[in-house]
Amino acid sequence: MAQFFQAKPNKSKQLSAKLSLSVTQLDHLGAGIAQHQGKIVFIPGVLPGETATVQFVEQKKSYAKAKLISIESASVNRIKPHCPHYQQCGGCDLQHMDTNAQREHKQTALVDLISKLSSAKAIDADIVADPIVGEAWHYRRRARLATLFDKNTQRLQLGFRAGNSNKIVSIQQCPVLSESLSALITPLAANLNQLKAKASLGHVELTQADNGNFAVLRVTKVLPASDIRWLTGFAEKHQLNLLLQDDAGQLTQLFPLLPAGDEAIALPYYHLAQEAVRCSFTPGNFVQVNGAINQAMVDQAIEWLDPQSGERILDLFCGVGNFSLPLALKAAEVIGVEGVPEMVQQAKQNAIDNQLDNVTFYHADLSADLSTQTWLGKIDKLLLDPARAGAFESLQWLQKMQPKKVVYVSCNPASLARDSSVLLASGYRIAQVGLVDMFPQTHHIEAMVLFELNI
């Protein structure tokens, strides 16, 4: 068979070409979806119903990625972003979308993913719960600010990482951070730039707790006494609980000053008011960033799990006891299991502080089979709140224990959908599913699903 030369497509021309596309929907990561020559095209920054001029940035066999050049026809759900750093800072990616439209999209994306990626049939509308929603702005009670020392200018940058980059975007305020923490950013940056050892500063972790605002400053070297005095004065002026953290993770409290001989630092804490529980935590411990939504989420989890006075409940990936402690007020016994030893120790202390003697915490490898552990025993109900990777390994042995109800809290609907298949194949059905709008202005989806054992 004769062979003829065929010129290969010019990829640089394909990528540089601009074209007009119509957006039909958003994917679960918040990117717009359009079609071009039989390919799906993903376009960040656009909304369903819009026509946009775009430029390809990546071409694959079955899909392409493009960047937005301009909006030709705008959606009624498009709004002006609140933040001057939007699309530079990597924190928010949906500020251009009306808040109610964001929630509708997330709820739809959640249900679609569970239907498509798990073995579930179409999710009936009557088991889709109303989304848990709260304030759209100034909702974050915690943030980590990155620092970068510029040797040329001798200035310290303070801000957030740019999207998909290590570059730091200097910021003056943040509209999703609590107002009191947002107001600290500019004076904090100015203060840190007055230090002699500013090149030795790492990130800054800001936390708004029920007992005040906290700042933990990472340092790579011991600071001179003049810098300590300067930082202490700043903390006193702003009534800020200020701690230093060295490379070994050791914390030193600068303000308020500790009494002579007292080494116990003041820890931030939050209350779960409905359950009259107080949760203390240390820097590095995971806590939900949205306090109001966390309270509503805990309330709904308890309502769905419906703990009874004679039941034993397992809380896997329990953290510092966010669910375990309030569950212990209703159940006969709660067992909390966590993979991070420091959080297990804090959870144990929280149980003591709340005078709860029917909750026990254990440190374990959460990817291992724990069914043979003598402390586990019979489990009546189960609560899971894993990290983004999900709980696939844990469910291999958990489903054999056949708890009557399982409440699965997830920050990744894709791993939630995958894990749902394990439970559905083990005799469970989805009884409730709902969005938890933990992260407004971002594409991130928090969700809760109730599984019930078919009897």
From Swiss-Prot:
Family: Belongs to the class I-like SAM-binding methyltransferase superfamily. RNA M5U methyltransferase family. RlmD subfamily.
Residue positions binding [4Fe-4S] cluster: 83, 89, 92, 174
Entry keywords, A to Z: 4Fe-4S, Iron, Iron-sulfur, Metal-binding, Methyltransferase, rRNA processing, S-adenosyl-L-methionine, Transferase
Organism whose genome encodes this protein: Shewanella frigidimarina (strain NCIMB 400)
Disulphide bond pairs: none
Protein name: 23S rRNA (uracil(1939)-C(5))-methyltransferase RlmD
Binding sites annotated in the UniProt record for S-adenosyl-L-methionine: 288, 317, 322, 338, 365, 385
Database matches in NCBIfam families: PRK13168.1, rumA
Catalytic activity, as annotated: uridine(1939) in 23S rRNA + S-adenosyl-L-methionine = 5-methyluridine(1939) in 23S rRNA + S-adenosyl-L-homocysteine + H(+)
Annotated active site: 411
Molecular function per GO: 4 iron, 4 sulfur cluster binding; iron ion binding; RNA binding; rRNA (uridine-C5-)-methyltransferase activity
Lineage: Bacteria, Pseudomonadati, Pseudomonadota, Gammaproteobacteria, Alteromonadales
Biological role stated in the UniProt entry: Catalyzes the formation of 5-methyl-uridine at position 1939 (m5U1939) in 23S rRNA.
EC numbers on record: 2.1.1.190
GO biological process, one term: rRNA base methylation
UniProt xrefs under CDD domains: AdoMet_MTases (cd02440)
